Amino acid sequence: YESTVYPGCVEEDCVPLLEKFSKLNFNKDFFCGYSPERINPGDKKRTISSIKKVISGSTPEITNLVNNLYIQIISAGTFKASSIKVAEAAKIIENTQRDLNIALINELSIVFNKMNIDTEEVLEAAKTKWNFSPFMPGLVGGHCIGVDPYYLTYKSKKIGYSPKIIL
C-alpha cells in the first residue's frame, strides 16, 4: 500500500478483507508492505526520488523486499520503520502537524491583525530564533493534509480517546 491512512488501517482493516475475499492467510499465503506517499505535487525541487521514503512490511523479509524495490528509484534513500503501524503513524503525524501549525498561525494572524500588528513582521522577528518553525498564514494545501487529522481522530475515538487539539 502507498497511501495516507490511520495507524492500524492496513493490518486491522485491509488485511481482514483481503483474507476474507481471497481465502488466503496473512503472512503465510500473502504479505503486506506499506510506504506512505510523500510527494509534493508541483514541487520541482523535492521530487519523488529526492524525498526519503519510509518503508515497512508485515515481516522483516517483506520490509527488505519493499526496501529493495524503493532504493532503485529513491535516490534520497529509505527509512525502515519497525512496523506498518509506525509507518502509518509517521505519515499521519507529518500532515497533522502541518495542519495544526498552519491553523495556529492563522489564528495568531487574526489576533495580531486585531491588535494592528503586522504578522509577516512578527514572523520575520521570530525566525531569528534557531528553533522557531516558520509557517505562513493561509490555506493548508495538498489533497490530503486537511483530512488526515480526521483519520487520526477517527482511530483515536475507536480506541477510547477523544483528541483535544488534533482538529
Positions of predicted regions on the chain:
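Structural/interface elements that position substrates and couple domains in central-metabolism enzymes
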Residues: 1-167
